[in-house]
Amino acid sequence: MSDLFTTFDSNGVAEHHLHHNHNSTSSASGLLHDPPMASPSQHSPMTNNSNSSSQNGGPVSGLGTGTGPISGGSKSSNHTSSAAGSENTPMLTKPRLTELVREVDTTTQLDEDVEELLLQIIDDFVEDTVKSTSAFAKHRKSNKIEVRDVQLHFERKYNMWIPGFGTDELRPYKRAAVTEAHKQRLALIRKTIKKY
C-alpha cells in the first residue's frame, strides 16, 4: 500500500512524497527509497526552489492533467529541464476546454484570447488551492493534505461547499435576517386578517 504525503521546506513550499509500505525493505544500501511526487507548486515561478536539486522528480498524479513523468532519476538529477516542462504544461489543455464548452453548448466557439484567459484562471485556481491547503496542513502540523484542508479553503475563499465530502460536524442552518420592511409587511397582513 502506498501513501502520498506532503512535507514542507523552510519556505513553506509543499513537497509531495510517495512511500510504499513493505514488510521487508532491504536493498544493496540497506534501505529502499521511492521517488517523491512532484506538485504544481514546486515548479511555479512564484516559489523559491532552493532545495529542488536534492529532490527526485516523478510523475504528476491526481491532478487530471494526463501528463507523464516529469523526470526520473537519482538524487543528483538536474531539474531545470523538468521545471520548464511542468510550467509549460497547463492543468487543462485547449482541446479539453473546447470539449467541455461543447458539453454545455454545442454551438459556442471561444475566441483565442478567451481560451488563454480561462486556462490561466484554471492554473491560478489550482496553484492557489494547493498553496493554501498546504499551509492549512502545515498549520495542523501534518505531513498530509486532507480533504478537510481543501474544504476549508473552498469554504473560506470561495464560499463553496463540495457535496459528497461531508464532515462529522453538523453545519448550522443559517436563517435569513428579518428586515424591518418584512416586519412591517407581516404587521399589515395580520391587521388586514383581523378586520375580516
Curated annotation (Swiss-Prot):
GO cellular component, as recorded: nucleus; SAGA complex; transcription factor TFIID complex
Amino acid composition bias (Low complexity), ranges on this chain: 48-58, 72-86
Superkingdom classification of source: Eukaryota
Region spans: Disordered: 17-97
UniProt cross-references to InterPro entries, sorted A to Z: Histone-fold (IPR009072), TAF12 (IPR037794), TFIID_TAF12_dom (IPR003228)
Major localization class: nucleus
Chain ranges of the Histone-fold domain: 93-160
GO MF: DNA binding; protein heterodimerization activity; TBP-class protein binding
Any one Gene Ontology BP term: transcription initiation at RNA polymerase II promoter
A family per Pfam: TFIID_20kDa
Cleaved signal peptide residues: none
SUPFAM superfamilies: Histone-fold (SSF47113)
Biased composition (Gly residues): 59-71
Location of this chain's protein in the cell: Nucleus
Keywords, alphabetical: Nucleus, Transcription, Transcription regulation
Known function: TFIID is a multimeric protein complex that plays a central role in mediating promoter responses to various activators and repressors.
Subunit structure: Belongs to the TFIID complex which is composed of TATA binding protein (Tbp) and a number of TBP-associated factors (TAFs). Interacts with Tbp, Taf2 and Taf4.
Family: Belongs to the TAF12 family.
Protein name listed in UniProt: Transcription initiation factor TFIID subunit 12
Species of provenance: Drosophila melanogaster (Fruit fly)
Name of the gene: Taf12
